[in-house]
Amino acid sequence: MEKIVVYTDGGCSGNPGPGGWACVVIDGDDARELSGGSRSTTNNQMELTAAINALSVIYNTPRFKSRKIEVNIDSQYVKNGITSWISKWKVNGWKTASKKPVVNQELWQQLDKLNSALDVEWKWVKGHAGVEYNEICDSLCQKQINLFK
């Protein structure tokens, strides 16, 4: 069975400011684009929201749930958070190493729930480097940001 390939992106005009998120969920030759935005948000919130929406589509599509998933993301914050930092945050009661509450905790908890229920491999891709689906996500993000300006 082919794996599901995902690309995500999130961004803001100002931080905080109007923001957008986008994802592309690819199953063989079928690519599904999703996007949304918010009038007042942060870059990191939009990056997390993109990943949550992508994994939600997969989780809620029965034929996808048992498949391997490759998430390509240009956010080191999300990639490192979900693959490394989150296990320590949970052990520490959602506190960072410096004993401060984890920023965007609710979003991290949503992402963790989906990530734990699926077979996900997280890969970092360089943003604005000509990676086709990453560029599509970036363009969709910009359209969403412009709706809220």
Predicted regions mapped to residue ranges:
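RNase H-like nuclease fold core
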Residues: 1-45, 56-59, 138-143, 147-149
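RNase H catalytic domain
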Residues: 11-15, 52-136, 140, 144-147
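Short, conserved alpha-helix that lines the donor NDP-sugar binding/gating region
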Residues: 47, 51
